[in-house]
Amino acid sequence: LCRSRKDNAWAEANPDEVQQEYLISDRHTARGTKLRIHLMDGFHTQQLKVNTLDDPKRWWEVIDRTTGEVVPTDKWFFDEPTGEVEIETVPYHEYTVSFLAFLIWDPVHMYNFLTNDWKDTPHQLTYDVRQPKTQAYVKEKLRRWCEANPHIDVVRFTTFFHQFTLTFDDQKREKFVEWFGYSASVSPYILEKFEKWAGYKFRPEFIVDQGYHNTMFRVPSKEFRDFIEFQQQEVCALAKEMVDIVHSYGKEAMMFLGDHWIGTEPY
């Protein structure tokens, strides 16, 4: 059973609960006192779409990478029609923009589509089972499935909730892959819960990590370790609810270890 995809009708009807990922732009050097950065340069627009539903000033971050300082929100704005962020800059300093994007093509399905050279298969959208509407819908759908399939005694969860980081570039090549990556386990809903749990304000930099995306070769920050702990607690609690539903119908539950496993890793 796939819990986070294979239901495009639901995802299309609830675009606010499509899964999201934190992205970081390339570094750009300012030649003067103004700089415009096109957010989706280098990313595949069939996989990712800039989140324009939630407030950029709340959830995005512009950083002067020359000094390491965060650029105040009154010194930049998002020009939605062009997809660019305009920044008031110091000449010859480098800048990046960290921003939220919707995963409008499931990364695993995109990988299979490209690897197998599928032609006419519809792209599978994602949806975030952690969020209220989708969570209620998926639980009820699981109950209906169990009732409709009494002859099946073992249920394998192919996916739980969050895909490891698998991001494609504008040439449909793998731009960044991290089997233990948490970059695609985010949303304002989740991050507000994290802030209450952790007791401090979330920053996109905790995830994008100067563009290293907290690869296994990096020493994780305290904030990222906090985020991992929070995600594992939340994901495992919700996964248990799904397993309990399966058990309530007298069925055995097992999990496929491999893609949407973030928050359930056994090691």
Predicted regions located by residue number:
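Glycan-processing catalytic domains of CAZymes
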Residues: 1-267
